């Protein structure tokens, strides 16, 4: 029905082949291209911002310093002093996801964080890292993480499987949360925009007046999507910090 009426809200998530290399042996999709672009933007912004550091920072340097302090404080507050060694990873993850979310808000760009394969890969990497950190700090003693302290022995056969399932579900919840929020926002955006165009093309002058409502909703939704882009990057980063905290401190 949606496609018959001219609205294809899911078409924006379709993967298309862009350019290739080595005689098409390696092909880049629009998702790959946006990920490369996000990496280039993050790197370029900080290279330009910090190339000529001044005592009184300019706009670019100020933005870079605010971003640095924001993530640095988040890492220290969540993980503690041990978190300093993981700051580069968390900061890169936060910046990459944030820019990826924002890129998807512009016409002709693609939100690669709207694909579960991408968010799943990021979540699995975080899960693997936090697990390795746990064994690195505690060795085989990390398995005690699944045995909550102070629990009666007779309850352990029930609680340990629950703890294991909860632990293994972390990458699922982490990836689905980011994927679902970005996808839902873009679908609503497309539906309102399509509805507005249908009113204008189908009702003429009356449709132009009627389209004011979906236009206003689309403008409000656009502002909300920029906020969601930041919040989802923050949530992914803060949960990464929490998982690393659990691995280091065993609670």
Swiss-Prot record:
Keywords carried by this UniProt record: ATP synthesis, Cell inner membrane, Cell membrane, CF(0), Hydrogen ion transport, Ion transport, Membrane, Transmembrane, Transmembrane helix, Transport
Bilayer topology term: Multi-pass membrane protein
GO CC term, one of those recorded: proton-transporting ATP synthase complex
InterPro entries per the UniProt record, alphabetical: ATP_synth_F0_asu, ATP_synth_F0_asu_AS, ATP_synth_F0_asu_bact/mt, F0_ATP_A_sf
Predominant location: membrane
Domain of life: Bacteria
GO molecular function: proton-transporting ATP synthase activity, rotational mechanism
Gene3D superfamilies cross-referenced by the UniProt entry: ATP synthase, F0 complex, subunit A (1.20.120.220)
Record flagged with keyword Cell membrane: yes
Coiled-coil ranges from the UniProt annotation: none
Keyword Ion transport assigned: yes
Transmembrane segments: 30-50, 86-106, 116-136, 145-165, 195-215, 219-239
Localization: Cell inner membrane
Pfam families cross-referenced by the UniProt entry: ATP-synt_A
SUPFAM superfamilies: F1F0 ATP synthase subunit A
Function: Key component of the proton channel; it plays a direct role in the translocation of protons across the membrane.
Summary of subunit composition and partner proteins: F-type ATPases have 2 components, CF(1) - the catalytic core - and CF(0) - the membrane proton channel. CF(1) has five subunits: alpha(3), beta(3), gamma(1), delta(1), epsilon(1). CF(0) has three main subunits: a(1), b(2) and c(9-12). The alpha and beta chains form an alternating ring which encloses part of the gamma chain. CF(1) is attached to CF(0) by a central stalk formed by the gamma and epsilon chains, while a peripheral stalk is formed by the delta and b chains.
Homology family: Belongs to the ATPase A chain family.
Protein name: ATP synthase subunit a
Organism expressing this protein natively: Acidiphilium cryptum (strain JF-5)
Gene this protein is translated from: atpB
